[in-house]
Amino acid sequence: MTKKRKLKPRVIAIAGFAPDSRDQVNEEPDTSEIWAINNAYLFLKRTPNRWFQLHPPDWKRNEGMPAGSYGREPEHLELLKESPCPVYMQVKTPDIPSSVEYPLGDLVERFGRTYFTSTMAYIMALILAEHDDGQNVGEVRVYGINLTTMNEYFRQKACFEYWIGQAEGRGIKVWVPASSGLLKAGLYAREAVSDDVVTMTEERCEAWRQR
């Protein structure tokens, strides 16, 4: 009887847009999968394996972005239409042949939690679902994602870190760059927190309360 060949664990690199580490994703070997968000094509040197554009078509219309371009410049829509890789979207879109509806309902039912405050959270949940279904993932590498701007810090960072914890709980290694603000903080009751960090946090909290 022929032995079934054991596949090597998958390595998935998430390509975000923060400039301090995003270009490092281009150093990934061809064996790594690249899962890219929004307009990461501006710096990627190869076609990603999957692309995620999970915003509504008229996102940021009130900020001057053109209608139907998903909150980006007009050429963004054209690139979506021409994408050779699957493009995960809220719904399958006829004008974008490679579009795939993101399976939100299935993932909420599977994980029993409706907690997705960023594209990165959606991505990590999909990775976990595939891993749980036997498509073994050994490592996730996170490039270009800091989540330290006002909105990201308060609304998105904790959620993405929650899903990172879910991955690590399954034995999946998660790597983040030293420059990223993810998974970093002083030890409670053991390390002094700098006044600069305290001031910054207080200012952010006050601004958040006044919204």
Language-model regions: role of each:
Residues 1-211:
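Metal-ion/cofactor- or nucleotide/acyl-coenzyme-handling active-site neighborhoods
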